[in-house]
């Protein structure tokens, strides 16, 4: 694949409670054909909206709230899965090449917005109740304010799934098991630092590149959530999931081109804002509800779930301490970390995910 926009184009014309396909032509200055709907073009790195249910929910809500008068045209596979694809989405929105975009919060610490790195602090946000508490705090709005330096306007931070270590030959438990391995991940300063701190080498590889690198043995594991692990057909290539190690959650950040937002009417902007707020509010319950069924599917496909011992967990945290030291060098990021740590102290983690009988590693 070559860098740049992929040809896959999906138009989501969402009206009332249904979605339909449409195309736009001959737009006026508000972005719509005379008398027709406003069409907003959205860059997205995956192959389709189903890869990020909270983002798909935002798109659906825009259609419902606007009665179909605002449509979001999703341009999938933006960046063709190259390591810098998510950064390309941000830049495309900033320059007005597209109107809207979304990217994982992980990428922004590589683009001069370090505050989002607190969301990727390893093994900090390790439960869905805590992730939900973070979203319901002041943190998202404070983090989104930093996006102005990238010439985009933040709309919302959406919760997404917890990501685990997944490996080819054996479960990744204590740091000694990580030593010398190459681990697939996404472009992220914090996440790449964490993998190095555990003794492994980070390799930015996702989409078809992850599959290719697994087949060639270039990577021996990766960080991913169980839902995508099943959906992307990766179980046969890497069977071992460490169930009780949540490295970090994925957060999906929605943003818009400021000039394009200004060209909309006040009502159209309000629909976008309401859709973003609603999607953020329900994002964690949406993805958390898929976790149990995904574990069962993975088990049926041959995955095996391992449990790190208390000693393993302590060793992991000790190795990862250097990542926190680096995060705390930025005053704002340090403040964000302290707020998340306080939320963690006051938020019960909820029950551990149930692992089906016969699905534990070694069985």
Task: Please give the residue ranges for each predicted region.
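Non-membrane alpha-helical secondary structure
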Residues: 1, 6-7, 312, 332
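Secretory targeting and sorting signals
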Residues: 2-24
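N-terminal secretory/targeting leader peptides
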Residues: 21-125, 153-363
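Short, solvent-exposed loop/beta-turn-alpha elements that line the ligand-binding surface or hinge
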Residues: 126-149
């Amino acid at each position: 694949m070559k860098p740049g926009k992929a040809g896959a184009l999906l138009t989501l014309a969402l009206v009332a409670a249904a979605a339909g396909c449409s195309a736009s032509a001959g737009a006026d200055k508000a972005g719509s054909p005379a008398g027709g709907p406003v069409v907003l073009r959205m860059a997205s790195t995956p192959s389709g909206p189903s890869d990020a249910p909270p983002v798909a929910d935002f798109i659906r809500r825009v259609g419902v709230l606007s009665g179909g008068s605002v449509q979001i045209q999703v341009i999938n596979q933006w960046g063709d899965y190259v390591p810098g694809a998510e950064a390309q989405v941000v830049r495309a929105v900033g320059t007005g090449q597209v109107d809207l975009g979304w990217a994982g919060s992980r990428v922004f610490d590589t683009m001069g917005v370090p505050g989002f790195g607190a969301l990727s602090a390893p093994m900090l946000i390790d439960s869905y109740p805590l992730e939900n508490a973070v979203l319901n705090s002041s943190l998202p709005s404070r983090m989104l304010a930093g996006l102005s330096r990238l010439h985009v306007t933040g709309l919302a931070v959406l919760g997404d799934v917890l990501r685990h270590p997944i490996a080819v030959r054996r479960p990744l438990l204590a740091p000694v098991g990580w030593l010398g391995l190459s681990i697939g991940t996404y472009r992220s300063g914090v996440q790449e630092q964490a993998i190095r701190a555990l003794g492994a080498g980070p390799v930015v590889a996702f989409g078809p590149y992850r599959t290719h690198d697994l087949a060639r043995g270039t990577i021996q594991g990766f960080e991913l959530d169980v839902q995508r692990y099943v959906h992307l057909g990766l179980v046969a290539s890497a069977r071992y999931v460490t169930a009780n190690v949540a490295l970090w959650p994925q957060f999906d950040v929605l943003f818009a081109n400021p000039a394009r937002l200004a060209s909309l009417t006040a009502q159209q902007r309000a629909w976008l804002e309401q859709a973003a707020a609603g999607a953020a509010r329900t994002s964690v319950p949406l993805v958390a509800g898929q976790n149990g069924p995904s574990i069962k599917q993975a088990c049926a496909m041959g995955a095996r779930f391992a449990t790190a011992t208390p000693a393993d967990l302590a060793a992991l945290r000790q190795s990862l301490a250097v990542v926190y030291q680096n995060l705390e060098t930025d005053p704002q990021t340090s403040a964000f970390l302290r707020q998340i740590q306080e939320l963690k102290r006051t938020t019960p983690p909820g029950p551990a995910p149930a692992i089906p009988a016969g699905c534990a590693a070694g069985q």
